[in-house]
Curated annotation (Swiss-Prot):
Name of the encoding gene: rplL
Lineage, uppermost ranks: Bacteria, Pseudomonadati, Pseudomonadota, Gammaproteobacteria, Legionellales
Sorted UniProt keywords: Ribonucleoprotein, Ribosomal protein
Name of the featured protein: Large ribosomal subunit protein bL12
NCBIfam families named in the record: L12 (TIGR00855)
SUPFAM superfamilies: ClpS-like, Ribosomal protein L7/12, oligomerisation (N-terminal) domain
Single GO MF descriptor: structural constituent of ribosome
Length: 126
């Protein structure tokens, strides 16, 4: 069996679609029993800063709960917001509830929520 270098792996990941990378991350989480969120928790606030962070959240995840009656309009909005291709955007819309954008500022999250709701989707901020 040939050994793959880190560069070979990085190049392969760079050539994958966003949805394929998401699937890869999920598979790695399952295989190794880890979570991609663990790194975020480690880099989070330290002693005493946690109370302030709980009071004022600065990063939000935009979660689409439903695409409503205008599926095509929502797919177009997803493509504009995320830069995904048609197939990836369609897969994201059809897999609701799904996170559209992660760790965005409150202003950007509100803007994305407004765009998706105008297209007919039901959206939550987490």
């Amino acid at each position: 069996m040939a050994q793959l270098s880190k560069d070979d792996i990085l190049e392969a990941v760079a050539n994958m679609s966003v949805m394929d990378v998401v699937d890869l991350v999920k598979a790695m989480e399952e295989k190794f029993g880890v979570s991609a969120q663990a790194a975020i928790a480690v880099a989070g606030p330290v002693a005493g800063g946690e109370a302030a962070a709980a009071e004022e959240k600065t990063e939000f995840n935009v979660k689409m709960v439903s695409f409503g009656d205008n599926k095509i309009g929502v797919i177009k909005a997803i493509r504009t917001i995320t830069g995904l291709g048609l197939k990836e955007a369609k897969d994201l819309v059809e897999s609701v509830p799904s996170v559209v954008k992660e760790s965005v500022s409150k202003e950007e999250a509100e803007k994305i929520k407004k765009e998706l709701e105008e297209a007919g989707a039901k959206v939550e901020l987490e």
